[in-house]
Regions:
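Acidic/polar loop patches that form or flank catalytic/metal-binding clefts of enzymes
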Residues: 239, 275-279, 395-396, 415-421, ...
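Cysteine-nucleophile active-site neighborhood
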Residues: 21-25, 29, 359-462, 526, ...
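C-terminal and late-domain segments of enzyme folds
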Residues: 458-555
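Short glycine-rich loop/turn motifs
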Residues: 174-175, 451, 507-508
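Flexible phosphate-sensing "switch/lid" loops adjacent to ATP/NTP-binding sites
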Residues: 1-332, 338-365, 372-373, 380-386, ...
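Active-site proximal loops enriched in glycine and acidic residues that flank catalytic Cys/His/Asp
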Residues: 8, 38, 218, 245, ...
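Short low-complexity, flexible loop/linker segments enriched in glycine and/or proline
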Residues: 49-52, 228-229, 409-412, 514-516
Length: 555
């Protein structure tokens, strides 16, 4: 197994995930099989209980793993299906070691960070690296490992030490370290400053790891003199110092790496030049250029509660992008904080309230994504009502589906106090209820998670046609509340149709509103399986409806 390790320095948020994914893309384009591992040094065992404001969205895998959003980047870029074990956290490592200690596996020894924690990290990496993720038999050729955080963080020290030991045990020709750093330009001086990167590499070298390549993030391409200076002070050949400067879209990043011969530097270090071919990135080039040249736009109102951080809805944004490009449209995301639509906001901040409604009405379609808690839900209900009454294309995902059921029950059935038991436990009309198998005492890993089957009830519905009329679809889930089965009959009698259910027929998965251009709610999360070359059918239909092309597409 060959290992490519990506670390980061100076500041977080430099784009290590995109860089690691792009490295995987280029190596895969050279004919190699690639897998990925993300290391998160936090103590949580997984990302499931972390707020989107902390680390962005929680990405869900087929096996139900709740993981860091960078694994979503890996799946989209590399077109692979990862497992929960491809995300290593400090919590998982310590839990596994403590479990072994309680069983007596260490035979009376004092359990310490070195060697027990570091050995557990190495064992985890080497065992997960050989699990095939591309649908083929046998292990991959290269495992790309991204270490989260920045070099020098206390919590990442055991992982740095484990990677140092791994580099020694597997041998230099099986280990390539790429350090992502920042090269800022100070406004007054206007010079590309190398000192932050110098300090970061010095810190890395002090911990026993020497980078083979530097991936330098900057606004503009690195100057030759900047590369020479970095080479001199960081002991990295100038040819191995990569300029990862700002580009129009992230699909240019693999192309940047190819243009700078990053693949040859990596292949040379890993002794793979003899078996790898030149990278074939025609599809990536076409996609990047297509996006750059799009002129026709479509305005999408994103009505959510985490709108202050776009990474909270990263997979939704990517799924919209994939769908728009397949339809030759450029997405214009119009962020609407759900709470700004509520009547209370009109009293507190009338200008903010008016601006939110103006944005909503100016959009060609409305999307209400997933979320938890009752903040902003009344605003979402108002958005769903506006879409339903004004024939505006609407897509509700997870919470967004439940919102549309609540709105319909209130407005059409006349149940003014209809609500979700999540938002109002004492509601007389709970049209959304807690799952029978859910846990009320533990939050972590107790939801309905991962890939589940949804069976279609009517193949004439829009959703079934978009999926090409299969008997069922497999999509990923993440919820602990669902539509009340006892409310379904009344809702359907009033015109809201449930077109997809689970294998029991009791759990509602898809709803549609007939005689509406596109009014769809789904309990699952279609965004998690969208790929650049294979956009989610639901997002494609949503975008087509917004541009008035859905009817022609379906016929």
């Amino acid at each position: 197994m060959k290992y490519v390790v990506v670390t980061g320095g100076v500041v977080s948020g430099l784009g290590k995930g995109v860089t690691a994914s792009s490295i995987g893309v280029v190596l895969k384009a050279c004919g190699l099989r690639v897998t990925s591992i993300k290391i998160d040094p936090y103590l949580n065992t997984d990302a499931g209980t972390i707020s989107p404001f902390e680390h962005g969205e929680v990405f869900v895998l087929d096996d139900g793993g709740e993981v860091d959003l960078d694994l979503g980047n890996y799946e989209r870029f590399l077109d692979v299906t990862l497992t929960r074990d491809n995300n290593i956290t400090t919590g998982k490592i310590y839990q596994s070691v403590i479990d072994r200690e309680r069983r007596g596996d260490y035979l009376g020894k004092t359990v310490q960070v070195i060697p027990h924690i570091t050995d557990a990290i190495k064992d985890w990496i080497t065992s997960v690296a050989v699990i095939p993720v591309d649908g083929r038999v046998g292990p991959a050729d290269v495992c790309v490992i991204e270490l989260g955080g920045t070099v020098g963080d206390i919590e990442s020290m055991p992982f740095i030490e484990a990677l140092r030991q791994l580099s020694y045990s597997v041998g230099q020709e099986n280990f390539c370290l790429i350090h992502v750093s920042l090269v800022p330009v100070l406004g007054v001086v206007g010079e590309q400053k190398t000192k932050p990167t110098q300090h970061s590499v010095r810190e890395l070298r002090a911990l026993g790891l020497t980078p083979h390549l530097l991936a330098c993030r900057s606004a503009q391409p690195l100057l030759d003199q900047t590369k020479e200076k970095l080479s001199q002070f960081c002991h990295v050949p100038a040819g191995n110092i990569l300029s990862i400067h700002d580009v129009p879209n992230i699909w240019h990043v693999p192309l940047l790496l190819r243009y700078q011969d990053a693949h040859n530097a990596i292949l040379k270090q890993l002794n793979l030049l003899s078996i790898a071919g030149p990278p074939d990135l025609q599809e990536w080039t076409k996609r990047a250029e297509t996006f750059d040249n799009l002129t026709e736009t479509v305005k999408v109102a994103m009505v959510g509660k985490y709108t202050g951080l776009s990474d909270s809805y990263l997979s939704v944004l990517k799924a919209l992008l994939h769908a728009c490009i397949s339809c030759s449209l450029k997405p214009v995301i119009q962020w609407v904080a759900a709470s700004d639509l509520e009547d209370e906001k009109a009293k507190e901040a009338p200008q903010v309230h008016a601006a939110a409604w103006e944005t909503l009405k100016d959009s060609a379609c409305i999307l209400v994504p997933g979320g938890f808690g009752n903040r902003g839900t009344e605003g979402m209900i108002l958005a769903a009502k506006f879409a339903r009454e004004n024939q505006v294309p609407y897509l509700g995902i997870c919470l967004g589906m439940q919102i549309s059921v609540i709105e319909f029950a209130r407005s059409v059935l006349g149940l003014e106090k209809a609500n979700s038991a999540e938002f109002d436990p004492d509601t007389p009309d709970p049209v959304v209820i807690f799952m029978p198998e859910g846990s009320r005492t533990h939050m972590g890993n107790t939801m309905r998670l991962g890939s589940r089957k949804t069976f279609f009830c009517d193949h004439n519905c829009i959703t079934s046609k978009l999926y090409n009329n299969p008997d069922h679809v497999d999509e990923r889930h993440r919820h602990r509340y669902e539509v009340n089965p006892d409310s379904v009959e009344a809702l359907e009698a009033a015109g809201l149709k449930f077109m997809g259910k689970d294998e029991t027929g009791r759990r509602m998965e898809i709803l549609e509103l007939p005689n509406h251009p596109f009014y769809v709610g789904v309990q699952f999360h279609p965004e998690f399986k969208s790929r650049p070359g294979r956009p989610s059918p639901l997002f494609t239909g949503f975008v087509l409806a917004a541009s008035g092309r859905l009817k022609a597409y379906l016929s």
